[in-house]
Amino acid sequence: MTLQYTALGDSLTVGVGAGLFEPGFVQRYKRKMEEDLNEEVSLIVFAKSGLETSEILAMLNEPFIMEQVKKADVITITGCGNDLLQSLEIYEKEKDEHVFLEASSHCQKNYSGMLEKIREIKGEKDTRYLVRLLNLYNPFPSIELADKWISGFNRHLKQLESAPQIKVIDTYAVFKGREKEYLSIDRVHPSSRGYEAMSEKLRAAGYGRLEG
């Protein structure tokens, strides 16, 4: 049996920062799944650098993407990093903390919308699939407010684990204290090592009912 893995998201799902011809976390996770489950995994990626959570949510209304979500055994989602970067730029100019709260609320609402849409596409009876939401790591550890905002957002994201098939992957913990090693030369996106660590964290979350 071939399993389908559908990956949705932003530049992290694209694999920006990994280096020329180096895989991001998506391809690495696919390989680990194949090893662990002893099954072939078919991968399809819907991702673009710069996407905000509202745009990722909007993708779930496109017929072809909906079809690939319906068929998916495993779905991963990355998002909110671009919302964060925009907030930081505004904060640098205006010094108003509310921009972070607004971005956090916006991201939470969109993530809830994504899960709701996936449930709608899948139908009530299908519960054998997995959804893995990757939370935010902090590429700016020296900016105290950014860390406070990201930690707060991650706490809220964790609350979306409302069903056994949904898990939030703690990317924040993976990168904490290892930014030099796990960030690429642009100091924002993961390096190859960072993506490998992300795929290991995904692997550690297990495969739920797919292991049955």
UniProtKB/Swiss-Prot annotation:
Q: Indicate yes or no for the key word Hydrolase.
A: yes
Does the record's keyword annotation contain Hydrolase?
yes
Q: What EC identifiers does the entry list?
A: 3.-.-.-
Which Pfam family, any one, appears in the UniProt record? Answer: Lipase_GDSL_2
Q: Which GO terms describe its biological process?
A: sporulation resulting in formation of a cellular spore
Recite the UniProt keywords alphabetically. Answer: Hydrolase, Sporulation
Q: Which residues form the active site?
A: 11 (nucleophile), 186, 189
MF terms in GO:
lysophospholipase activity
Per UniProt, subcellular location reads as: Spore coat
InterPro entries membership: Ester_Hydrolysis_Enzymes, SGNH_hydro, SGNH_hydro_sf
- Where is it mainly found? other
Residues binding substrate, per UniProt: 50, 82
Q: Which Gene3D superfamilies match?
A: SGNH hydrolase
Task: Please give the family membership noted in the entry.
Answer: Belongs to the 'GDSL' lipolytic enzyme family.
> What does the UniProt function comment say about this protein?
Lipase involved in spore germination.
Q: What is the name of this protein?
A: Spore germination lipase LipC
This chain is encoded by the gene named: lipC
